[in-house]
Amino acid sequence: ASPVVCEDGGIRLGAWIRDSMAGVGTLTYYDPATGSYGALGHGITDVDTAELMPLASGSIMETMVKAVKKGQRGDPGELKGDFTVQRDVGTVTVNSNEGIFGTVEDAGFISGEAVSVAEPEEVHAGEASILCTISGSDTRAYEVEILRVNPRSRDGRDLLLRVTDPELLETTGGIVQGMSGSPILQDGRLVGAVTHVLVANPAEG
């Protein structure tokens, strides 16, 4: 920004400042050996400029999903939740186009069995599942179908999937805001994360 000389002779400088952001997202993976995690599957961007936000520091908290705004064609839905603000459970040290990354400091909220990570050539079109929370803190697996795999995609959107689970479709309409980062599992392995929803068809992303 450049200063401007006003009519009264004074010099003025306008500045748009945003010092913090908060939102609901989903943890993609946690490595108990290192305490590291990845989440969101995409970066945190400024809501006005769509530019990646520079990060000085950040934290993650547990969230209770209280309500769901169901997605419809042309109108993306949303998970609405309350943060457990009594304590942070980890730090955010990296905000990148591939997601946010950091360290989990209190893993008491994490449960489930460990899975291996698939090699890119092992991912294929067909049945799969995503893990997400659409009520309270209950994380469940929901059925999806991988329609297309494009490992050479330059925008990081390496596959196209469609939600096929009747319960998830009934409750959310498909993929909604807040599900970003939901792990995609196929053949017992982690193959990716949900990153975006197709606005024209919320069942796909």
Regions found by a protein language model. Give the residues of each.
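C-terminal recognition in membrane/secretory proteostasis and scaffolding
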Residues: 1-205
